[in-house]
Amino acid sequence: MHKAGFVNIVGNPNVGKSTLMNQLVGEKISIATFKAQTTRHRIMGIVNTDDMQIVFSDTPGVLKPNYKMQEMMLHFSESALADADILLYVTDVVENPEKNVDFLEKVGKMDIPVILLINKIDESDQKKLVELVERWHSLLPKAEILPISAKNKFGTDVLMKRIQELLPESPAYFDKNQLTDKPAKFFVTEIIREKILRYYDKEIPYSVEVVVERFKEET
C-alpha cells in the first residue's frame, strides 16, 4: 500500500507557516523573516519514503488585499483550500481567533481533515493556551487542535505522525527524488530577497522584487 497527498498550510501573516514547512520537509524551502507576508508564492516541499509521498504547500498569509500583488497572494491561499487532502491551519498565541472570519468559514465547511496548529506556545503559558484551545474549538469544532512550537520543533513529530495516518492511499504525484516544484533560480531570488528584508528596514521598499538576470549552475 502506498500513500500520497497534498498537505496545504494556510493562515494569517507572521504565524510561522514557512518555519513549519521547513521543519516538516527537513530543508529550507520557504524563506522566513519578521516581516508579514514574506511568502508571496505557493511553494511545494515534498517528503518521500518508500511507501509514502507528502506534498506540503506553503502559502502567503491571508489578509484583505489592498493592491494587485496581495490579490494574487490571497488567490494562492484560497486555491490551497480547493486541492488539499489535509489542511493545516496555522495560528499563534497572540492572534485574535476572530480575525478573517470569512476565510475561517470556508475552512469550517471543508470535508477533509483540518488540523489547527497553535504555534509559538513557548511564548505563552498553560492557562492562556487552554483558553485559546477552547476559543478555536468553538470556531472550528471539526478541526483537530495541536499546540506546537515550529521554531523549537515541539509537537512537529506528533504532527507528522498524524499526517501520515490521515494521508489517503494513492500513487506518488511526483518523482521520488524531487524535493520541490520550483527551479533553483527561484530559490536564488528568494534567498536574496530574504537577506534584503532581514538586514534592511526603511532603506528599501517593503514590496521589493529581485530579478536574476543571469544564472549558471556549477557542474
Residue ranges with predicted function:
Residues 184-219:
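P-loop NTP-binding site
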Residues 8, 22, 41, 45, ...:
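Solvent-exposed alpha-helical segments within well-ordered globular domains of core cellular machineries
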Residues 113, 122-184:
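Canonical P-loop GTPase G-domain recognition
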Residues 36-38, 60-63, 93-97, 121-124, ...:
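Conserved nucleotide-binding/hydrolysis micro-motifs of P-loop NTPases
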Residues 11-12, 58, 118, 212-216:
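Flexible glycine-/small-residue-rich
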Residues 48-51, 72-145:
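Conserved C-terminal guanine-recognition region of P-loop GTPase G domains, centered on the G4
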Residues 1-75, 79-81:
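Conserved G1/Walker A P-loop phosphate-binding module
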